[in-house]
Amino acid sequence: HEVIHQASEMSRKRGRIVLVGVVGLNMRRDDFYKKELSFQVSCSYGAGRYDEEYENKGHDYPLAYVRWTEKRNFETILHAISSGSLDVKSLITEEVDLADYEEIYGDMRKKGSIASILRFPADSKMESVVSIGSNAFVSGNGKIGIIGAGNYTSAMIIPCLAKAHARIKYIASAQGLSAKILARKAGAENATSDYQNILKDPEVDLVMVTTRHNLHARMVIEALRNGKSVFVEKPLCLNETELDDIIRAYQGAPEGTTLTVGFNRRFSPFAEKMRRLLGDGPKNIVATMNAGFIPREVWVHDLEIGGGRIIGEACHFIDLCSFLAGSEVVAVCMNALGENPEENTDNASILLRYANGTNAVINYFANGSKSYAKERVEVFSQERVLVLDNWRKLTGYGFKGFSSMKAGMDKGQKRQFTLLNERIREGGEPLIPFESILNTTKAT
């Protein structure tokens, strides 16, 4: 409060107080009222900071709208330094070899330094692979390279692979640090900041792509062209052009190269039980995803990066319905919520028509209550009904010898990765037929 008060005392009438950094904001009205002062909090580098459209997509603010943007601030400072009007050299207190970094960071308050420079060795070689050394592999098949070290990879994929006793040779991430941390946790042999090291290693049999959605297609194609089998988290791709390129890469890959998409729900014991009980023939399927609200600024809504939640998430249930139907989608239509729904809507009802006469309705809603089950599937067939409640309980009506099945929540991830690891080591048919993957992706 005192800092703001002093600033108001110093300011002229109708002046502006700009806060750079963090101080308490317990302000007094009188400090601003008498002089009609304005108060502004400055973003760290200037307007545009934390704005995805500005920072990563290059959409600048008009000059008349914002004079000093993040980019213009940097440009002005760099120009001032290059012209000599701003002297920063005199601020440099010391230069220290990287090996002696503790001289700077030991006790910064006592040091009295204004600015310090860390000097890297002139002959140092940039390495994109770091050996973790916890697991030296023996000869044999089944080695895996993972591209992507995000939350889902860490929380779900790595534990499932560990239970399957999978051999992870690489974990890659763009920055490298997250890959190294996760590699230590997973017992992987290497961490890398360049996924090309995975693609070019002849010992790697399976490449797992777990990055943001817009990178899936490119990395799948590169892996296939390098003769690697691929597992990619859903979705396979974001548009038909990418899908056509994937088809060509798959058809041109060496014999025995497989492509699997992370449609894990079909591998749940609940889904497999439903498929056995229902058998063949036409069915009516109603699948509801109470997906929950995600703020609009989150990347999954960005059509160029995430593809929207229908492409990015609802594809799970299109594959599940296809698995339960035992047939391929031949027609699709969709109605979205609202008078003028957005292209990246996350409130929609999807109607699927299958070749064997099955009808499926998928309700993907983001406007429901968190207290209601996230996922529910109902199937009607031959005077029988199956109801799956949130992957915890399956109830049957009209079935001889079956009434219900209960277990802990199981969406099929564990079985999916166990089977995948077995296939990579021992060979066998693809987990999901390529034609089924294509059909689901086209329908999505």
Regions found by a protein language model. Give the residues of each.
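Rossmann-fold NAD(P)-binding glycine/threonine-rich loop
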Residues: 6, 20-38, 42, 48, ...
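Predominantly a Rossmann-like dinucleotide-binding segment in NAD(P)-dependent oxidoreductases
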Residues: 37, 47-65, 81, 256-258, ...
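N-terminal Rossmann-like dinucleotide-binding module
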Residues: 126-186
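Beta-strand-loop-alpha-helix segment that lines the small-molecule cofactor/substrate pocket
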Residues: 12, 217-263
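Contiguous beta-strand/loop segments that form the cofactor/metal-binding neighborhood of enzyme cores
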Residues: 106, 110-122, 284, 312, ...
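Glycine-rich cofactor phosphate-binding loops and adjacent beta1-alpha1 units
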Residues: 1-40, 201-206, 211-215
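Glycine- and charged-residue-rich phosphate/anionic-cofactor binding loop of Rossmann-like
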Residues: 55-102, 167-168, 404-405, 423-440
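C-terminal capping/lid region of NAD(P)-dependent oxidoreductase domains
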Residues: 18-22, 29, 36-37, 63, ...
